[in-house]
Amino acid sequence: MIERPVPGADAPIGIFDSGVGGLTVARTIIDQLPHESVIYIGDTANGPYGPLPIAKVREHAIRIADELVERGCKMIVIACNTASAAFLRDARERYSVPVVEVILPAVRRAVASTRNGKVGVIGTVGTINSGAYQDLFSASPSIVVNAVACPRFVDFVERGITSGRQILNIAQDYLEPLQAEGVDTLVLGCTHYPLLSGVIQLAMGDHVSLVSSAEETAKDVLRILSQQDLLADPDMHPEPSYSFESTGDPEIFAQLSRRFLGPIVSQVRQNEG
């Protein structure tokens, strides 16, 4: 375990993803915990993680999480489904600070949401092949789970393409098997996918509930920080700080980040990884 001085309540929350997808989680955390400071690292030089071998994903995740811990973050949020599947168990053994992931919160929400017990899961190849979602759903034997990999979605989001006929056609092809199975709840098992929720909803139909882990993950962050007396005190630190960083091209990352988060992204720093 990496031992560091115990961070105080005024320390930042560290969040990372392979790219911009984790901004969906960061945005929800910032909205729900407005007094918390955040360091966000998008590993765009090495992402997307989905097609990579699990060992390589774990290597990248360790490098970034180690950095966030070394920089004094009081909590690590793995805002990437593929990295959560590859790294969560190791992370909780490796770090003394709490680690939050995005898979269990989505499963919890889906189990509560489904009406007919038929749930679909879409994600990267790495996430789907890991069986992480399927394993967690097995604790609810009344739920029938169908999982489909949608490998091209991440590339579209990373290029800033979140609507249009081309991506809709691809979505319809990916999602047709889930429609045929009659799922009434669809887990967006990649933090990039909420940025395609309009297209995905159109392809699935309004009768299908889309589940994003962002809201539930933010609830976990709030609960754990409260339990460990690590919530930032607005009287002591009324102005939170936000640092957005990319291991790839910071300008491209900044353009996409501002599109999704707005002016809160004043600049994006180059992270040398």
UniProtKB/Swiss-Prot annotation:
Enzyme Commission number(s): 5.1.1.3
For the biological process aspect of GO, one term held by this record is: cell wall organization
- List positions binding substrate: D17, S18, Y49, G50, N81, T82, T191, H192
Q: Which reaction does it catalyse?
A: L-glutamate = D-glutamate
InterPro entries named in the record: Asp/Glu/hydantoin_racemase, Asp/Glu_race, Asp/Glu_racemase_AS_1, Asp/Glu_racemase_AS_2, Glu_race
Q: Which keywords does this Swiss-Prot/TrEMBL entry list?
A: Cell shape, Cell wall biogenesis/degradation, Isomerase, Peptidoglycan synthesis
- Active site (catalytic residues): C80, C190
Q: A GO molecular-function term, please?
A: glutamate racemase activity
Q: In which pathway does it act?
A: Cell wall biogenesis; peptidoglycan biosynthesis
* Pfam name, any one: Asp_Glu_race
| EC category name | isomerase
UniProt entry tagged with the keyword Iron: no
Where in the sequence is the signal peptide annotated?
A: none
The cross-references to NCBIfam families, in alphabetical order and at most eight, read: glut_race
UniProt lists the family membership as follows:
Belongs to the aspartate/glutamate racemases family.
What is this protein for, i.e. what is its function? Provides the (R)-glutamate required for cell wall biosynthesis.
**PANTHER family (alphabetical):** GLUTAMATE RACEMASE
Q: What protein name is recorded for this chain?
A: Glutamate racemase
